[in-house]
């Protein structure tokens, strides 16, 4: 489960377009940030998580946040200033078992697109040529279609799909998407047979106003996933005034709808003992100025984490990770604190305000005044030390969470160690 938003420059504090996303997945699935430089192809095909795809002659440089076992990413940006976030949506069309994962579609679109509109066309072509689907879960089976929020410096688009059928809408001002369809009859473009297909299945009556969401969505999953509640809350927050980088962090940390562990109604999601449960495993804010400015947690639950700045160009990034596993190790160093904190919320929030909030504000003030490589390295190194410090202070604190949530997290902690011993290899077929 995930939530994404975009605010065009006309509605932001400094005139730059801002994108934000929380990636909500299984709590034991590490997610980390990766940089891939611009490449010139050698004619070989591309091997994604699930499929072999024809490669193009040249790809853009990209920075993506990706689950450990995937080729693609949950959210990312390229060196042309195109940013994309995807969401799982649950529709009436059958999900293919051999399609492209939405995260792989996202990465390919970033590698190939020059603008937001170009990315929309690229995604549509990929869905038509290769299909979408496959198992998107880590230790569980999870099949779904995808929606995408796509932006560049000037424009943004919402693209929603159901198998090969799709509709898209150009964003005016701001937009948010969640794990539900949002477009009714107000889309700007769509699959030529999107209405006829709904009529053929009996999902839409000819002669009545067509709504993509009403016709194609599985309403029960929308309700139990809390998607509608999260979407409405994010829309409310976006309408409260001009959005800044700091305000974007606050939006992704929001807990207005529920204080309970395991609730699917919060933008900042904490896993717990409930029938359906996910956790925010990484968060990203992208500011689209002359050069993309990325603020990433590379750790779970943003309300207990620190957003850190990263910059990149076509061939280099300021990301202080030398090896792919460095990002996973950083995620793990914070996870020790996160798992103590979730069960000791009051004391954890005190520590976060004391150690993290001021540090994050200092980073915001320093951004642009220090060499990018130095600031990113300092941000990741110091935040890792902060996590260790808070862990040591929290270990002796009394647990506040109830019996069932304590049992839930005991199971998750044991499972995390098992997965770590296997280098977080996926347990079930994709």
Question: Where would I find each of the regions flagged by the language model?
Answer:
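Substrate-recognition/cap regions that form aromatic- and gly/pro-loop-enriched pockets
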Residues: 270-396
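Acidic, low-complexity N-terminal propeptides/linkers enriched in Ser/Thr/Asp/Gly that mediate export
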Residues: 4-11, 16, 275, 373-430
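Residue-level signal for secondary-structure boundary elements
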Residues: 118, 131-135, 260, 371, ...
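Second-shell loop/turn segments in exported
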Residues: 105-112
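Short, charged, surface-exposed loops that flank catalytic or proteolytic processing sites
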Residues: 112-120
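Short, well-structured alpha-helical segments that form the helix of a local strand-helix-strand
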Residues: 119-128, 245-259, 376-383
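Accessory, solvent-exposed terminal regions and/or long lumenal/extracellular loops of proteins
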Residues: 241-269, 273-278, 359-360
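A contiguous strand-loop segment
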Residues: 1-102, 122-244
């Amino acid at each position: 489960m995930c939530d994404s938003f975009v605010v065009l420059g006309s509605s932001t504090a400094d005139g730059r377009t801002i994108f934000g996303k929380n990636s909500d997945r299984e709590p034991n699935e590490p997610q980390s940030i990766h940089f891939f430089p611009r490449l010139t192809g050698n004619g070989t095909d591309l091997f994604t998580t699930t499929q072999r795809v024809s490669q193009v002659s040249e790809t853009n440089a990209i920075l993506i946040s990706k689950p450990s076992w995937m080729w693609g990413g949950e959210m990312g940006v390229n060196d042309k200033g195109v940013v994309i976030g995807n969401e799982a949506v649950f529709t009436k069309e059958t999900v293919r078992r051999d399609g492209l994962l939405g995260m792989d579609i996202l990465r390919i679109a970033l590698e190939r697109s020059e603008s937001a509109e170009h990315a929309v066309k690229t995604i549509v072509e990929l869905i038509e040529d290769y299909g979408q689907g496959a198992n998107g879960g880590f230790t569980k089976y999870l099949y779904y279609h995808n929606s995408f929020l796509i932006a560049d410096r000037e424009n943004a688009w919402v693209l929603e799909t159901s198998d090969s059928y799709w509709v898209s809408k150009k964003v005016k001002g701001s937009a948010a998407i969640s794990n539900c369809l949002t477009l009714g009859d107000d889309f700007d473009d769509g699959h030529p047979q999107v209405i006829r297909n709904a009529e053929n299945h009996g999902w839409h009556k000819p002669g009545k106003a067509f709504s993509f969401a009403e016709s194609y969505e599985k309403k029960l999953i929308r309700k139990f996933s809390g998607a509608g509640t999260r979407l409405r809350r994010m829309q409310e927050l976006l309408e409260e005034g001009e959005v800044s980088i700091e305000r974007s962090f606050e939006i992704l940390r929001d807990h207005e709808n529920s204080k309970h562990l395991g609730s699917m109604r919060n933008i900042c999601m904490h896993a717990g003992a409930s029938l359906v449960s996910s956790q925010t495993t990484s968060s990203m804010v992208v500011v689209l100025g002359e050069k993309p400015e990325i603020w990433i947690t590379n750790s779970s639950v943003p309300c207990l984490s620190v957003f850190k700045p990263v910059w990149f160009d076509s061939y280099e990034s300021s990301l202080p990770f030398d090896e792919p596993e460095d990002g996973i190790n950083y995620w793990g160093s914070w996870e020790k604190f996160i798992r103590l904190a979730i069960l000791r919320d009051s004391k954890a929030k005190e520590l976060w305000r004391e150690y993290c909030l001021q540090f994050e504000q200092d980073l915001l003030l320093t951004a642009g005044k220090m060499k990018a490589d130095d600031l990113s390295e300092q941000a990741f190194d110091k935040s890792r030390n902060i996590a260790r410090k808070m862990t040591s202070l929290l270990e002796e604190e009394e647990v506040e969470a109830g019996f069932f949530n304590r049992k839930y997290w005991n199971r998750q902690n044991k499972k995390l160690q098992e997965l770590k011993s296997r280098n977080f290899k996926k347990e079930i077929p994709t």
